[in-house]
């Protein structure tokens, strides 16, 4: 029998254009700092395989590849850092930044030459910063000047402008190091990755605090202790999910709260007690909209154990995931998207039944296709699976991956896997690759028993072209993903070579006319020559 509850699945990716090598996530592309108006990050360019450092590349909004260099017109500034590293600042309004889902996105890559001298992208990383950046109150001049140079606690890594430093609620002096530092007050921030950041000066009270006694009120274990200290400052940084942080939801707002307190030196004798220290108790709150899609919070959902198998119809949850490699050992999380890929690089897709332990259930895929937007009905479309089988009209056919061989799965019949080579949509008139997002969609149903013929798809061996019309069968439902693909170009010189060596197409009719005219001219000359000889 068929269990009618099913799901229509899709998932986002980021693509790049053709290249031979597959990019890998670059661990040394890091050090990101999200400023109020620009990205700040550092990159280590030293290659482990060659003494020649690779080139730093970036993609524009149309997916074309460029060398990353100083270009004020495009809002990029590059400077040499310590050792082989480079520091980069990129304006959110520049040529290489795209806005999506309340975030600024900037794909960065490292380009190296192979043994034949062909340059290709070998590493990629996508930097993300939130669009909404709330400025904090700037400390007064007295609170800044009163901090000795040797006792200043850095507020942000260099390079940073005065405007960006003030947006963080910190002090700025370009002639000193650090140039951006905390003032003699309390500076608290709610970071985009879901952390409290609280800097406290001992001079925030009079008399000064016992600075080494400042601690979180509800937890004081190792992860909740200060991450940095000077003789004047302590800096706390901890996630919303730890250190006794309280959460409450009021209307459309989620509020995260914690408290800092400072101990006092109390002197006691038989007739009473005294103290000469200030009372300090600080409550810090971070407030976010529950309906926002750009919460800077890493959310973990802990579900109850699945119920025992039932034989009657009931609600089912299906999930589509993208694996990081062909082993399906790990998957991209929601925070990893958009995912950067090169064209023709395989994407490993998995659709599964969730939270069920009935081994007799089977998952059946119907259609899988791609669209350039979130709507599964959007045109143009490109099929990947048709009636559960690879679409034969594609020269890079989708590959079905048997799940039964996966020994680490308790219920293999709950899973379906396939791989597809990444691609970009092409304008049917201009014959150029379309920029913008690309989405994957699938329709699926759950059947029982899993081994029944109705649950098994048999694909024809012949390379007969199957109908690519996308239609929805009874007993299937739908759901759409919320992330895009980004189209990127893999080599800088491919478009230049195409333009250099391409020529306008030759009209065959024009060639025929030219040949006929040539024949007539030659014939006329020959007749004239014979007449001339006869006359003489």
Curated annotation (Swiss-Prot):
CDD domains in the cross-refs: Trefoil
Signal peptide positions (record): 1-21
UniProt keyword terms in alphabetical order: Cell membrane, Cleavage on pair of basic residues, Disulfide bond, Extracellular matrix, Fertilization, Glycoprotein, Membrane, Receptor, Secreted, Signal, Transmembrane, Transmembrane helix
Tissue specificity note: Expressed in oocytes.
UniProt topological domain (Extracellular) ranges: 22-511
Domain ZP: 189-462
Pro-peptide positions on chain: 463-536
Cystine pairs: 368-442
GO BP: acrosomal vesicle exocytosis; binding of sperm to zona pellucida; negative regulation of binding of sperm to zona pellucida; positive regulation of acrosome reaction; positive regulation of humoral immune response; positive regulation of T cell proliferation; prevention of polyspermy
Subcellular location: Cell membrane
Membrane topology, as annotated: Single-pass type I membrane protein
One Gene Ontology term, aspect cellular component: plasma membrane
SMART domains: PD, ZP
Annotated P-type domain residues: 142-184
Glycosylation, residue list: 70, 203, 220, 293, 303, 333, 474
Entries under InterPro entries matching the protein: P_trefoil_CS, P_trefoil_dom, P_trefoil_dom_sf, Zona_Pellucida_Domain_gp, ZP-C, ZP-C_dom, ZP-N, ZP1/4_Ig-like
Spans through the membrane: 512-532
Cytoplasmic side: 533-536
PTM entry text: Proteolytically cleaved before the transmembrane segment to yield the secreted ectodomain incorporated in the zona pellucida. Disulfide bonds are formed between the cysteines of three consecutive regions: Cys-368 and Cys-389, Cys-442 and Cys-447, Cys-455 and Cys-459.
GO terms, molecular function: acrosin binding; identical protein binding; structural constituent of egg coat
Name of one Pfam family that matches: ZP-N
Family: Belongs to the ZP domain family. ZPB subfamily.
Domain notes: The ZP domain is involved in the polymerization of the ZP proteins to form the zona pellucida.
Function: Component of the zona pellucida, an extracellular matrix surrounding oocytes which mediates sperm binding, induction of the acrosome reaction and prevents post-fertilization polyspermy. The zona pellucida is composed of 3 to 4 glycoproteins, ZP1, ZP2, ZP3, and ZP4. ZP4 may act as a sperm receptor.
Name this protein carries in UniProt: Zona pellucida sperm-binding protein 4
